[in-house]
């Protein structure tokens, strides 16, 4: 069900909108984490390392597709808030057609160049073939990833954050059983996890389309989905390019960090894989609160309600702060039990606990940076989110390299480099926020 966010009490609205987003993304992360948990327990740390190495690579390419969806969803939210159904329909059809073509081309390119990508990443020869196979299978499912994210982001732009949650719950459950079947029963190793993931993504996409056909008349497939508006595509790319580059910048930074980690040995790579999964769970609610702020601000921006935009920003930042404190306590206190979910190797667990004790103290900083980025996305100024993310990731890699290679701090170097990156990001964002906020 769609929701008009231009009226009503803002704090309850943000909370109610955010909860399904959080649950949906946690389920999505769950079926990603299940791959790591199952291969870590039933195959070994080599397979766990292979899955972990592929994660930032596949995410980088997926985020290019998500950037297109993000740019479109901002415009869709604006047109929906302005009650302009004609432009809304043209926007949706143009985005879907362009995204399908782009995702298919990207799939072919990525599958062909997978070995070259992994060689550039300096992947250990002992796990190279295993990693290549996993990566190519995941790339084969990019078109399903795009379609689901497009329909889900469109529903959220219209105020419906619950329906995508239900599809992800079903998909996550199917993926868990699929992983167990392929890995435990068929002994297919990391390749089996990849196959299960692609099947789950395809089913999730199918559920989303069937729901829209039956329950959302505004989005039902038909002749209107064959309309291609080049002027709207240019505007979508203008928004989506900045969003895609911002997210790609984050992933390029993660790739840089992953390349540094790959030099530390399989045990550290396996530990980093596990803590990255935990980090994803920790950061996701912060990002979802920001996405709720974006949806609220985009609709109210389209409706010309500036005061509600200011109030929405303040409410969102309060939620970010509360969550930042909560997740610090959880990850600091339960660091070892969390690591034991992924692996039983004591050396790997030790590295992971060291990382979590340091990084959890800093979780409050990305809570603030995510909230600020939610504000700028909502008003359509995505260049600022790109610049601040570029500062963050550049500082991370620049600080991490000497801490690892010169001071030999090992995995402890990474949280310190993240801290430097987040501080740099805040320094880039705050002056622009203060200047922009005064105009609303």
Predicted regions and their residues:
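N-terminal transmembrane alpha-helices
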Residues: 5-42, 56-71, 75, 100-107, ...
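Small-residue-rich hydrophobic transmembrane alpha-helices
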Residues: 48-108, 145-164, 271-335, 366-380, ...
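Helix-terminus/linker motif at the lipid-water interface of multi-pass membrane proteins
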Residues: 26, 30-49, 118-125, 181-188, ...
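Transmembrane helical elements of multi-pass membrane transporters/channels
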Residues: 16-35, 137, 171, 200-204, ...
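Transmembrane alpha-helix boundary and packing residues in multipass membrane permease domains
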Residues: 21, 25, 37, 74, ...
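Small-residue hotspots at the loop-to-helix junctions and early N-terminal turns
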Residues: 45-56, 135, 194, 266-281, ...
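Short alpha-helical transmembrane segments in multi-pass integral membrane proteins
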Residues: 1-18, 76-141, 185-241, 297-362, ...
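Short runs within selected transmembrane alpha-helices of multi-pass transporters and secretion channels
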Residues: 69, 137-156, 164-172, 193-206, ...
């Amino acid at each position: 069900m769609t929701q008009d966010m231009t009226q009503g009490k803002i704090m309850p609205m943000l909370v109610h909108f955010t909860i399904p987003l959080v649950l949906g993304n946690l389920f999505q992360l769950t079926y990603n984490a299940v791959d790591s948990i199952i291969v870590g327990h039933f195959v070994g740390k080599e397979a766990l390392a292979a899955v972990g190495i592929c994660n930032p690579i596949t995410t980088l390419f997926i985020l290019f597709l998500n950037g297109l969806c993000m740019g479109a969803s901002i415009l869709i939210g604006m047109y929906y808030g302005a009650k302009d159904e004609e432009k809304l329909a043209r926007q949706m059809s143009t985005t879907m057609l362009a995204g399908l073509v782009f995702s298919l081309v990207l799939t072919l390119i990525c599958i062909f160049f997978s070995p070259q990508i992994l060689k550039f990443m300096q992947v250990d020869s002992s796990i190279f073939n295993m990693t290549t196979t996993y990566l190519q299978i995941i790339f084969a499912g990019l078109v399903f990833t795009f379609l689901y994210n497009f329909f889900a982001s469109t529903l959220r732009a219209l105020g419906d954050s619950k329906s995508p949650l239900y599809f992800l719950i079903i998909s996550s459950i199917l993926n868990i059983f699929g992983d167990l079947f392929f890995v435990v029963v068929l002994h297919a190793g990391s390749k089996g996890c990849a196959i299960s993931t692609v099947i789950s993504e395809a089913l999730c996409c199918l559920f989303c389309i069937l729901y829209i056909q039956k329950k959302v008349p505004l989005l039902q497939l038909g002749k209107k989905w064959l309309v291609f508006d080049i002027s709207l595509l240019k505007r979508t790319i203008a928004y989506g390019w900045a969003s895609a580059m911002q997210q790609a910048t984050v992933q390029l930074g993660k790739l840089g960090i992953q390349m540094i980690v790959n030099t530390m040995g399989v045990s550290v790579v396996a530990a980093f894989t596990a803590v990255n999964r935990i980090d994803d769970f920790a950061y996701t609610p912060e990002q979802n609160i920001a996405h709720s702020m974006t949806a609220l601000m985009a609709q109210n921006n389209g409706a010309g309600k500036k005061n509600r935009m200011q109030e929405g920003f303040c409410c969102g930042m309060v939620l970010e702060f509360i969550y930042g404190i909560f997740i610090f306590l959880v990850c600091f206190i339960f660091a070892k039990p969390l690591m034991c979910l992924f692996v039983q190797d004591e050396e790997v667990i030790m590295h992971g606990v060291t990382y979590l004790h340091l990084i959890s103290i800093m979780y409050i900083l990305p809570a603030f940076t995510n909230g600020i980025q939610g504000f700028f996305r909502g008003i359509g100024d995505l260049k600022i989110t790109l610049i601040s993310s570029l500062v963050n990731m550049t500082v991370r890699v620049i600080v991490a390299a000497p801490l690892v290679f010169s001071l030999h701090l090992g995995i402890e170097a990474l949280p310190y480099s993240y801290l430097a990156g987040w501080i740099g990001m805040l320094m880039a964002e705050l002056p622009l926020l203060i200047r922009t906020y005064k105009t609303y």
